[in-house]
């Protein structure tokens, strides 16, 4: 869990220069500025990936929990919006301690969500609508209810070393203690004593989520088998969860103190140099990439099978996931979380430009950028940046070069529901934190049910009680209302996806500048096509903008997309030298000769 931070302009420039200097062999400005000249762009390279959190998306049977039939019923909505790929948060069999991230059977569907027949129907329906399905794959750990763990705890020879087991140590009073000072991401020791086995097992997350031992070739083979099982079911790839936690130092040394906190049970108490981002992780990424490439080659009738990887890690680590120094390729899409972790509602225009340039400049040649604006683990866009910024942030997301990732509900500007009571709180870290502190860490606010309409439970479910409370603002903030409105966040989002079909946004050159501390702009240019300019005001005040220097000469602009509160309208002609942007406004324009 990376903490958001702000950098001074001087620090940013020094870091950017450092990145360029230390990575001299990498293409610097070419990946940032040059047009993509290839005739072929693979299906995923310009896709909008729409993350569905199934438990909160749509309930089809009235039990208060979203399910696969609910997802199937809403696939036409995704197709109508223009979505061509969706990744589903975990749907595998699970005790639901961490709501699917504690898997008890990788080859079965969670009973609450449906059956394997439902999943097969989902894939077939999605395929008929031109939508590809990506599954969330959780390899770092299983549930403690998984058959593998039960057999490992019993020292079954075939599963004895499937997990990370270790003896404890005795303190001066002869009391048994964990092997070292490693902490769980969810708070507390990362070690849990198992009475039957007579050893501790490692759990980097909840104690019900024991870590698998990827140094055991049998574990790797078992996970390969899981991937092949779902590939044969027709999925187009996987999003790999918590990737950088896969390996730990075998000698189990104490981790050095970070100095960030005096609480020895806090995850921030130590520097995680022995439990995260070990070199072996990269080898596993490359192994899985080869598996996917081999599968694609053997099944030429299907599209490229891809890997998306989740890791809150240093930039160099993420770039190596793309391709290492020896040219070995890994993840097609190492998730770029900079819009989540490195900018906020307090950021100025230079912060945004810096974080965009940093990824594009550092990315190895021949790879595809990606931009994740939100997910199920972090506050929503409307909460992080403010409701007035929703359209501008979606304009940013959908006109940058490469892949865009949208969390369900962001197209409406859904907001976190921060008033969930302690009694209704279900998120594991929040429950561990306790009644006084749960709101500081709970992920429940961003996971509330999708707001389809102003009907009971926002049209999500007919149940008397839903698994999480519905945000009360659904009465005014819902899809049905936004479809009927003259202007709405949803209509802006849909128009942006339509705009993305233009060759200039698929293959155009890219350049970006901060025009001031409060406004930045970028343009996409391609020979024989109109240039598009995206302008964003990140401040809470109206700004007068002169684009003349940025576009090299005075020109007229034609508005392509404007936000819901904008005074401008699509098709309107305006001057490049005297453009007024209201607070948090974004605008996309086409250039005309003066």
Curated annotation (Swiss-Prot):
List the signal peptide residues: 1-30
- What EC number(s) would the UniProt record show? 3.2.1.20
List the GO molecular function terms. alpha-1,4-glucosidase activity
Question: Where is the site described as Transition state stabilizer found in this chain?
Answer: 377
UniProt key word Hydrolase: yes
Short name of one Pfam family for this protein? Alpha-amylase
Q: Which reaction does it catalyse?
A: Hydrolysis of terminal, non-reducing (1->4)-linked alpha-D-glucose residues with release of alpha-D-glucose
Where does the UniProt entry place glycosylation sites? 140, 454, 537, 546
Q: Could you state one GO biological process linked to this protein? A: carbohydrate metabolic process
Q: Which residues form a coiled coil?
A: none
Task: Tell me the keywords, alphabetical order.
Answer: Glycoprotein, Glycosidase, Hydrolase, Signal
* Active-site residues, record numbering mapped to chain: 241 (nucleophile), 310 (proton donor)
Asked whether the UniProt record includes Metal-binding among its keywords, one would answer no
Question: In which family does this protein belong, per the annotation?
Answer: Belongs to the glycosyl hydrolase 13 family.
Q: What is this protein called?
A: Maltase 2
Its source organism is: Drosophila virilis
